[in-house]
Amino acid sequence: MGPDSPLACTSMISLRHLTKRFGSQTAVHDLSFDIAAGEIVGFLGPNGAGKTTTLKMLTGVLEPSAGTATICGFDLLTSPMDVKRSIGYVPESGAVYESLSGLEYLEMIGALYGIAPAVARPRIEQFISFFDLSMDTLRSKLLGGYSKGMRRKVVITAALLHNPPVVFFDEPLEGLDANASVGFKTLIQTLAKEGKAIVYSSHILDVVERVCDRVIIIDKGKLLVDGAPDELVAEHNSGTLEKLFTDLTGGRELEARAEAFAKTFLP
């Protein structure tokens, strides 16, 4: 199946008892949920909760210790190449080949996905225009010399270049300026309207509350809540998603410790 072949499926992402262990430590424990076409799902949790480990399993970077998962009907273990063709992934690290120019990197990504140069170049130019990048800079400057924001824009372009039906974003706004952030939020909402499944992992909870129509919160590798942000906030009498998050994940205790610590600086 080519990178532009339509993938007709309702449940884009399906997890059943997905588990990941590192030695005696269980990083992700028995996660089960489904994500449908057109959903933007905020995947939330404190540091060390298992979010990135889960995303790495779903994108084929890590192998699960137990359980199963499918991406658009393709099993992670038995159809890994079909899974990779079906997803776009913007990792938190945003690692790139620093010895390539931005254009060389994007053309390489297009070739890896089997996109003909005559098709890849116009797509790249569309993203360059959207992100207000310079073609001269992309062509002549190595990625190692790019700012963090420019590098992030290139990584996002690479993730979307093959038009995947499922996209995973891990802290996607990191390094983007205010204007680019606004444009990016509009972009993912438009992608969802086109039927793509978007998984959005971020610590910027007010953005998640505005952009996502569903949130999944995990802690210590276990699922805590799953539902529409406004419904979860109302159900727990939290007022905001941020307060719900801190109530569920022990953030109130950390706030109290921070206040006590700050008082030690008072004369």
Residues covered by each model-derived region:
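ABC transporter nucleotide-binding domains
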Residues: 13, 20-200, 205-211, 215-219, ...
